[in-house]
Amino acid sequence: MSRDSDPMKWYHGNLSREAADELLKQGYEDGTFLVRESSTAAGDFVLSLLCQGEVCHYQVRRHGGEDAFFSIDDKVQTKILHGLDTLVDYYQQAANGLPTKLTVPLIRDLPPHNTRSHGVTNLLHRATSKNESKVVFELLKCGYRNFDAKNQDGQTALHLAALHSDEDILKHLLNAKVQVNSSDSFGCQPLHYAARSKPASFIRTLISAQANVQGRNIDNGYVPLHEAAKHGNLEAVQELLLAEAPPLPRTSSGEFPFDLAKEAGQTAVEEFLLNYKLPPANTTRDQWYHGTLTREEAVAILKKHAKELLAKQPEVDTSGCFLVRYSESPAASGLVLTLLCDQVVKNFRISQADLYQNGNKVQSGGSKFLYIDDGPYWPSVEHLIAHFMRFSYGLPVSLKYPVPPQPKPEVPSFATIPRSNMKPKAASPATPPTPVSPHSHHQHPHVPALTITKKKQKENSSSMFNTLRLTSPKKALFDMNSLRKNKSKGKRSDSESSVSGSLAGTEQELQAAAPMLKSLSFSTEFSTFNADGVTGSGAAAAGEVYNVPRNNTPIEIDLPPIAQKTEAEVEYFTKSDVAIERERAGQWIGNGYQPTMDVLSLLDQQIKAPAVARLNSLGPNASTESEMASYLHRKCSGTPSTPSATEVEAAKLRFFIEPEKLVLDREIGHGEFGSVHSGWLLRKSGAGEESRLEVAIKMLSDEHSNKQEFLREASVMMRLEHKCIVRLIGIAKGEMLMMVQELAPLGSMLQYILDHGHEITANAELKVWASQIACGMHYLESQHFVHRDLAARNILLTARHQAKISDFGMSRSLRPGSTEYQFTQGGRWPIRWYAPESFNLGIFSHASDVWSFGVTIWEMFSLGAPPYGEISNVDAIKLVDSGERLPQPNLCPAYIYAVMQSCWKERPKDRPTFVYLTEFFARDPDYQNLPELVQTVHI
């Protein structure tokens, strides 16, 4: 293979996969590589790499359309890099998840200019920088083809024209069909630079050439409007808004254009933006809003519409079919955008937030602003949808085909209502009530109706902060700054929710409706109906009923015992908690919750040894394996009835691993149920080839009596599937009961921090891990599972930048030289991680897990220091009860410590949600690649 002085000559154009295999298998060393065009996806590339005599091919996916951002399209490889040259250099420094690092390129050509992040200054660059219009014109006229080449700062001639040239050079370059939306090394596109100082005509010319008015700087989140506002270019601001640029985009630090204008002293721009009147949206909710739908119903409606669309227009691409629905899912209560892309349905939560200017809340007609992820704020859902019909940023594809809802049944006329034969009492004339919408009789007391009248539109049209509003039916919109929805409210059936214009079916609803109906004549005399329930003290009492914290935590009000509640009302507990509560008898404490354990008696005392029981005595009349399969089938299916023999056999195939397929290696830990070994699971592929998967094997001690608890926890783990959760592979029954899980090669996060603290940085590993832990806990919350033992020792590292939550009431990692926090016989209860309601009352909830999360983050930034030092558990409880909290670690920034303190609020309902914590760490401005390292949570 020939050598070349230019290390970038590894590009082989449209070389086929077969030809790449043949080239690389000619005796080259491991790590030899080439890059070629993808034959399956236009604009993508393929990295072909030789390793141990085999050629591996990795799809290199392009991000951002024509811009040069790329990543290895693999579940493990999610790092997005600017330029193919940067990507190759990244994997030349280290393997970073590939089987080997890139070593020697197979020499051919340089990659295309528009795929690189850097280059060298050429004649066109110099002429453009000096505003030499004639030289630029002659270069382009004579067929100069390097017009998209980049200089050492990654800037094309168009970038330089936006900085230094007049409109003549701009038009020359645009006539040559240069790329208008490429980013330079500073993350800026040409329109970013033009927005700083260029006149309106220059901006207009760029926009007419398809420059992206919402192009986002990957380094700081700036869009052109931010640049124009910061530099006081009012002409550019006006031109961008005329081109439908969002007026309220956010930087990575959450700053709006008017914030930047104020900081820079650009008063005229600030006042213009604050008084800007947003035009009405060019779409209406009757085109795409479906009211309350489950995820499954939305998917079915969307796919049915796409099928009908294809039947009418066979050549159409159905990607972009969408609808908006109201979700009652515990994971995301509020409005959800459901979108079809490449035959896959994706869901995006529409969040809400207040808007502040100079520390004061900006009024928005009584409702909050809406947004998706880190996208711009909008005053109504109509404006948000209209925006995403124009721009796709943040979505896989722009919104194209709205799916209309089914026609609503007509509201019955008042003429059809039976009239009383009684002579009505004398009363002053009253205006007939407005017909009730299908959702209005179940409306949240603080949320206005979905329908917006023309009069309301006129009243709210003075500025962009007072325009069309849309709030959710029944409940407030979900927001990362809000707490969770109230789950103590009774839920109606789908059939009840769908009846249009029906009268209230309960006494409480009749009471609420009575004032409106008193002036009408019905067969029932409503005028004598007692409506006190919705006025005066009655209203206050109703308010108390709904004063349950929205993050599903018990508070100081009288509640019925858990056994009298429906399963939906206690769904924020684990299913195992529900089972425990049903099995227990005894007195209930004042707030309606029975402690899961008398923890006060166990503060610093040893746990009594359990009685010895045989492992194979789970059931009196069935084999151990059948009983286990029956138990796990019931738990995983949620069916209380005894499964059939066929179902038991199916459960065996699904859950059980033959013990002879497991090979034990060394012991790596010891836990509550027994020992933990590394080992291998022997498997056969479809072709009959045998392979070995490295796993962790947890074994239940033969003398351990808690087999039912062991299997119950196993059934919970089998239902969990998330990138940030340790995966349970199966169960084996040999001489003892064994659980097979994925192996975390780096072990416990706590031990890793203790061993490698000098290598760990707060802005990299610690924030990545914190975001992944929060993401995993949010997933557990969405599955109604309370961890109850979240701590650094129970977080495992499968890679340096991948943390996973483990130990769901089962084993604990062995920490050499210390057994202080082990759940073994003679161990201690982990009081130092518990919230006050947990160690005082034995109450566990998602909010108590948030407290434990705060302590876990404190451990991380303290590099493994024990919480509260060497004091006893009793003294630690006294400190917490007196209002004291853990001090700020040296490595911890003030804004992260503030979040820790919010996790340690006395009242559970005042603590943040895991949704918020995930967003907080993933959107941290100091570490831009965090979102790519965290698994997206499904709504």
From Swiss-Prot:
State the oligomer form and interacting partners.
Interacts with drpr; this is required for the recruitment of drpr and glial cells to severed axons and for the phagocytosis of axonal debris by glial cells following axon injury.
The effect of disrupting this gene, in the record's words, is: Strong reduction in the number of macrophages recruited to wound sites. RNAi-mediated knockdown in glial cells abolishes a number of events which normally occur following axon injury including drpr localization at severed axons, glial recruitment to severed axons, up-regulation of drpr in glial cells and clearance of axonal debris from the central nervous system.
**What are the ANK repeat spans here?**
153-185, 186-218, 220-252
**All copies of domain Protein kinase, residue ranges:** 662-921
* Coiled coil regions in record: none
Return the protein name.
Tyrosine-protein kinase Shark
Active-site residues from the entry: 789
Please list the residues that carry the modification Phosphotyrosine: 927
Renumbered to this chain, region (Disordered) spans 410-446, 476-505
The residues the record assigns to binding ATP are 668-676, 698
InterPro entries named among the record's database cross-references: Ankyrin_rpt, Ankyrin_rpt-contain_sf, Kinase-like_dom_sf, Non-receptor_tyrosine_kinases, Prot_kinase_dom, Protein_kinase_ATP_BS, Ser-Thr/Tyr_kinase_cat_dom, SH2
